[in-house]
Amino acid sequence: MAFLDNPTIILAHIRQSHVTSDDTGMCEMVLIDHDVDLEKIHPPSMPGDSGSEIQGSNGETQGYVYAQSVDITSSWDFGIRRRSNTAQRLERLRKERQNQIKCKNIQWKERNSKQSAQELKSLFEKKSLKEKPPISGKQSILSVRLEQCPLQLNNPFNEYSKFDGKGHVGTTATKKIDVYLPLHSSQDRLLPMTVVTMASARVQDLIGLICWQYTSEGREPKLNDNVSAYCLHIAEDDGEVDTDFPPLDSNEPIHKFGFSTLALVEKYSSPGLTSKESLFVRINAAHGFSLIQVDNTKVTMKEILLKAVKRRKGSQKVSGPQYRLEKQSEPNVAVDLDSTLESQSAWEFCLVRENSSRADGVFEEDSQIDIATVQDMLSSHHYKSFKVSMIHRLRFTTDVQLGISGDKVEIDPVTNQKASTKFWIKQKPISIDSDLLCACDLAEEKSPSHAIFKLTYLSNHDYKHLYFESDAATVNEIVLKVNYILESRASTARADYFAQKQRKLNRRTSFSFQKEKKSGQQ
């Protein structure tokens, strides 16, 4: 029998009733202000008592134990709630339904129609198990590859096959290049050989890869086993080797160059090879001349004419007026284009437009060009820098570095740490394309240590002039180098500049003639 006014019984009943179902722990907070068990152990002391604290034999405060139900026992799985029988049955029914979906029930039916013995025999036909004789005369792909293997093993350029990028397209950086082979016969040299190389390969590795692919395809003639005997030159789309530029540096990576068309040329100056003299044909035109390089004297005059016209028109399409070739010593006599250079017995020709003739004084016969002059003309396209002073109209001269090559002329200011640029205008770098250059003339030569030259170029449909000064030797070298470049290119801007200059001269001459005529009449 329990009394409801007994707080001890009420507290124990609440704790034992909620300990298995209350996850919040609020049952432990019931009657925390009036803990009956703690008050039993430590009764309140009367005021004035000095020994109010009750200590145990060991000097520690005595603990207390809450009342616990006898029915509740602590174990390892005390906090785990077991599944009910209903949940287990539902899980078993779900698995049975899934297994029934996977199974297919077929209802057995008796056969009504009777089939003949021949039809039953055709359902399960007996197969012949006789061994078939092997087919002879047909070669497998493996046998063919094994027969071709010795040819690849004998390739002296096998070490460069690792740079072949045909199997790495899309996964690794590769570069596709069309390579012309001038050492081929006249028919095969017109068609390029496509090579796919790894972008990380050097120029020397690309040369070895070209030689490896050339040998693997069985091309003729055979190549030299030494890769150093060959070099790569820049080539036009039709296979013509551009001799104005030096060959690519063999130690540079191939991804540094953006050319998609190259030519494999043999180094005649390599050890073990005989030297071969370069042959040049001079083609005179209205505003200069061109030097056309040929391999031998067996070349036809038609090929020389095509090269001369292409050199004259540059990147434009070879169309418009037609031209013919004439010997320099035989005016108005056209050269047979089907004949060879050897049969002409001449190395200097004139490029004349059809239905026209050479005017007197247009083509002046120059003296025979020596080999030193030819070398200077060819080396003029190589890059070279000069330190000169740029002359300005309203301010002091500026020290600049003048870089000249076959493509462009660059003017870069030389920075001087001592000179203060706070109160002066800083010179900006200038880049002039060679096709926009018009003239380079010697303006003044006072002494061997001081000379001035003028550089004229086209900028925004207007001709601008730049003046530079340096010692006489440097100025003469610059003027000669720029004029060699201008004579070999024959640009449109240069032709228009000379035409405008001639019109001004004619206008000035006619004006002075009319003035003299009026003064004579008076």
From Swiss-Prot:
Residues where Phosphothreonine is found: 86, 398
Region (Interaction with NBN), start-end ranges: 2-267
Organism: Homo sapiens (Human)
Keywords: Acetylation, Cell membrane, Cytoplasm, Endoplasmic reticulum, Endosome, Golgi apparatus, Lysosome, Membrane, Mitochondrion, Mitochondrion outer membrane, Nucleus, Phosphoprotein, Stress response
Region (SIN1-type RBD): 279-353
Domain of life per record: Eukaryota
Membrane topology: Peripheral membrane protein
Residue ranges occupied by any SIN1-type PH domain in the UniProt entry: 382-487
Entry comment, domain topic: The CRIM domain forms a ubiquitin-like fold with a characteristic acidic loop, which recognizes and binds AGC protein kinase family members substrates.
Function per UniProt: Component of the mechanistic target of rapamycin complex 2 (mTORC2), which transduces signals from growth factors to pathways involved in proliferation, cytoskeletal organization, lipogenesis and anabolic output. In response to growth factors, mTORC2 phosphorylates and activates AGC protein kinase family members, including AKT (AKT1, AKT2 and AKT3), PKC (PRKCA, PRKCB and PRKCE) and SGK1. In contrast to mTORC1, mTORC2 is nutrient-insensitive.
Protein name: Target of rapamycin complex 2 subunit MAPKAP1
